[in-house]
A protein has these predicted regions:
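Bacterial N-terminal signal peptides
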Residues: 9-19
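Boundary of Sec targeting at the N-terminus
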Residues: 25-29, 34
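Short, solvent-exposed, Trp/other aromatic-anchored flexible loops in extracytoplasmic proteins
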Residues: 100-129
Length: 158
């Protein structure tokens, strides 16, 4: 528990210091893609777990189960592993991104459960989708330092 609390504090500091996880979020015009994607803990979701597809991350931490939903269908959906590679000269973290799971579409009617890797100060779990302009968008799944809920934040890839 102490380790998780410390992780939440470091996460909050990281968000405060970096203004988000990546320059993509900080420098782009707000686009509805992020607001159409939703993530929450399985215990807080209003879904039938037996009806959901489950994706298990390598080195998954069994209690850490997130549900990803969307309000629209997104093509080229991926569950990705994120590893911090470096912090850019501008102070933004840059991640190595490894695809763990691919699905042609994340459908609004088909939530997906992700059994996540344990995460400390930076997100280690994420999702990627193709937006309406055909661009790949990568979002880290992070734990809020305020209330422990899950957050999506756009990240930069290596």
């Amino acid at each position: 528990m102490r380790k998780r609390f410390l992780g939440a504090i470091l996460l909050a500091l990281g968000i405060g210091l970096f203004g988000g996880w990546g320059s993509a979020q900080a420098n782009s015009v707000a686009e509805p893609t992020q607001s159409m994607l939703h993530v929450c803990w399985l215990k807080d979701a209003h879904v039938n777990p037996a009806a959901c597809e489950v994706v298990r991350m390598p080195d998954a931490f069994e209690p850490a189960k997130a549900v990803v939903t969307s309000s629209v269908d997104f093509p080229d959906f991926q569950v990705v592993a994120l590893d911090l590679r470096e912090v850019s000269a501008d102070g933004y973290p840059v991640f190595n991104v490894q695809s763990i799971y691919y699905k042609d579409f994340l459908r609004a009617t088909e939530p997906i459960i992700i059994v996540m890797r344990d995460s400390e100060s930076f997100p280690r779990n994420g999702i990627a989708v193709r937006d309406s302009l055909g661009r790949e968008r990568i979002f880290g799944i992070a734990i809020s330092g305020e209330d422990g809920s899950l957050l999506l934040s756009e990240v930069d890839r290596n």
